[in-house]
Design a protein with these regions (language model features):
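Interfacial loop-to-helix junctions that mark the boundaries of transmembrane helices
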Residues: 4-16, 41, 77, 93-102, ...
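A generic, lipid-embedded transmembrane alpha helix
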Residues: 46-67, 152-155
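C-terminal ends of transmembrane helices
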Residues: 26-38, 124-134, 183-196
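Transmembrane alpha-helix boundary signature
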Residues: 56-72, 83-94, 120-123, 167
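Alpha-helical transmembrane segments and their helix-start/interface "positive-inside/aromatic belt" motifs
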Residues: 37-53, 233-235
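Helix-loop-helix junctions within the multi-pass membrane cores of secondary transporters/permeases
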Residues: 86-87, 103-184
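Transmembrane helix-loop junctions at the membrane interface of multipass transporters and ion channels
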Residues: 161, 214-232
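The first (N-terminal) embedded transmembrane alpha-helix
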Residues: 15-28, 214-216
């Protein structure tokens, strides 16, 4: 019963969020362009599906993906899991609270795989990849583009997890990252540069963000000496 009540509240909140978008479109269509809306019934039906779909998705995030990401982080950072039956190592970890970042290799592997798989499934990336293939008349591969972006995101999330675990300052990663991007921009083909920057914006969206955010919060919450506010964010 509580879940139904919560779902209804999320649906109402989603309607409120979508109404301004509909208002802007109607204003420009009826007041500025001054033309009737074609296929009105189909548009209304599609809009209803968007609202209902968003509401279901948001409830799913809260009830499924966020808890899942935090649970995986908690299990992968558990002292007993890290010690792997080594009693002396477990005793040392429990006494000092200091853990070698290299012991978290399963966390890095999980971060890489979850980053890759969620990016491949990202609807925004799929939409841009389809358009890129269409306007380039097949010169840009649909799957090649998605896989290349997914590998980049996977590496980035793995590095982000290492940053949280090791306590390395975030600004070093940002500075190095921007230097690499600037160099790539200088040497990359002109055709790919605008698309690459757009992909940087759409890559982390509805599918990737919830799991990655939950992963970061889970890591910062379960690693000694880490702050959820300072260390948990920055992965995305």
């Amino acid at each position: 019963m509580e879940l139904i009540y919560h779902s209804a509240n999320v649906l109402l909140a989603t309607i409120k969020d979508v109404l301004p978008i509909i208002g802007v479109i109607l204003f420009f269509q009826l007041v500025v362009i001054r033309k009737k809306i074609e296929n009105l019934g189909r548009l209304v039906y599609g809009s209803l599906l968007v609202v209902i779909g968003l509401a279901i998705f948001l409830v799913g995030l809260e009830e499924g993906l966020f808890p899942l990401g935090e649970a995986m982080s908690r299990q992968l950072t558990n002292f007993h899991f890290l010690a792997k039956g080594n009693a002396s190592l477990l005793e040392k970890i429990e006494k000092t609270g200091i853990i070698d970042p290299n012991l978290y290799f399963w966390t890095y592997i999980f971060a890489f795989l979850i980053g890759f798989s969620t990016t491949i499934a990202e609807p925004a990336l799929i939409a841009v990849a389809l358009k890129a293939k269409e306007v380039s008349t097949g010169a840009i591969s649909f799957w090649g583009l998605r896989i290349a972006v997914a590998i980049g995101v996977a590496i980035g999330i793995s590095l982000g997890c290492y940053r949280i675990i090791s306590g390395t300052p975030l600004h070093w990663y940002i500075v190095v990252g921007y230097v690499v991007v600037i160099c790539q921009t200088y040497f990359a083909p002109k055709m790919i540069i605008p698309l690459a920057y757009d992909l940087g914006g759409v890559t982390t969206s509805t599918v990737t963000v919830p799991l990655v955010a939950a992963l970061g919060i889970g890591l910062a919450s379960n690693i000694p000496g880490r702050s959820v506010i300072i260390d948990a964010f920055g992965l995305i």
